[in-house]
Amino acid sequence: MEINKVEQLTDNHNQLLLLADPNQLLVDDYAQRGTVYEATEDETLVGIMVLLPTRPETIELVNIAVVEAHQGKGIAQKMIAFALQTAKQSGFHTIEVGTGSIGFEQLYLYQKCGFRMVAIDRDFFVRHYEEPIIIENGMVLQDMVRLSQDL
């Protein structure tokens, strides 16, 4: 698997970003302000992520998604390891990520990669998404869990 910086977003990139975040306006905003990386296997797109500096020594992993057919193969874990290394080499001291409070697999993955929970942003998904309800694991998604890791 290779991970490389994306210079120009394609429709395939955009569709994969929307898999993790269905708000096109938010995706467009942070993809333009951040750095987008793609993961490929045999020149086929299998994953994507966006890193966005948020404060002088802090960067956030604002989106990470793996093509559904390639999920469960450790791709996201390798991408997160790449993000941690890239952030550290770029001089950042902290990396943050936010995810849905009922995204059990995501919460497990981030903690497995060394992130620790630091806050809950109550009603984040209610405030920022036009869809009346986002259902995940059979529950209505309302809150965002914020996690961070010192580099």
PLM region spans:
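Short, flexible, glycine-rich and Lys/Arg-enriched loop motifs at helix boundaries
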Residues: 118-143
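Short hydrophobic/aromatic beta-strand or adjacent loop that forms the aromatic wall/cage
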Residues: 34, 141-146
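Conserved acetyl-CoA-binding loop-helix of GNAT-fold acetyltransferases
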Residues: 72-85, 112
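Active-site acidic-Proline motif in GNAT/NAT acetyltransferases
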Residues: 67-69, 73, 102
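Conserved active-site tyrosine of GNAT-family acetyltransferases
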Residues: 109-110, 115
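Acetyl-CoA-dependent GNAT
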Residues: 3-69, 80-81, 150
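Conserved beta-strand-loop-alpha-helix junction that forms the acyl-donor binding cleft
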Residues: 97-107, 122-128
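Conserved GNAT acetyl-CoA-binding A-motif
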Residues: 87-99
